[in-house]
Amino acid sequence: MKAFIDTNVLIYWVDDSARADVVEQLLAQEAVISVQVLNEFANVLRRKRAMALPDVEVLCTTLIDTCDVLDLSVRTHQTALTLMARYNLSVYDANIVAAAALSDCAVLYSEDMQDGLNVKLPGPASANALVIRNPFRA
């Protein structure tokens, strides 16, 4: 099952905690991320964690080698605009959700979004539907 992983979940991967183990398990599956997630991940590690750039590059390269990484696209952006209105999402969260849905992921793992929310793309009988799950919630 393809699963999209949000930045706020991946950040725990660099921690020495039980949550890091959960992220390792998610990455061992058919994990999908987007370039947006890579950018946000690098930004948080540099700005909030004060991690050295070579270490950030190693972690990002590992993600690139481990996950299916989606490029940003106009279609994703346009879909995100619709999802913003439908689900009251920020532009950044809507782009994450759009990327996950357009890549046929069944689940989007996120700590910040509404756990259990079922998201459907616009259009008649859209096959592109996914559920948002918090992987740290028991």
Feature locations, PLM:
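Short, well-structured N-terminal submotif of metal-dependent ribonuclease cores
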Residues: 1-34, 48-58
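Anionic group-transfer/hydrolysis microenvironments
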Residues: 8, 42, 112-114
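Short, well-ordered coil/turn elements that cap or connect secondary structure elements
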Residues: 26-28, 64, 125-127
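Active-site-proximal, substrate-binding regions of enzyme catalytic domains
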Residues: 40-68
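Active-site neighborhoods of divalent-metal-dependent phosphate/nucleic-acid chemistry enzymes
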Residues: 68-111
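Acidic, PIN/NYN-like endoribonuclease modules and their adjacent C-terminal/linker elements
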Residues: 97-98, 102-138
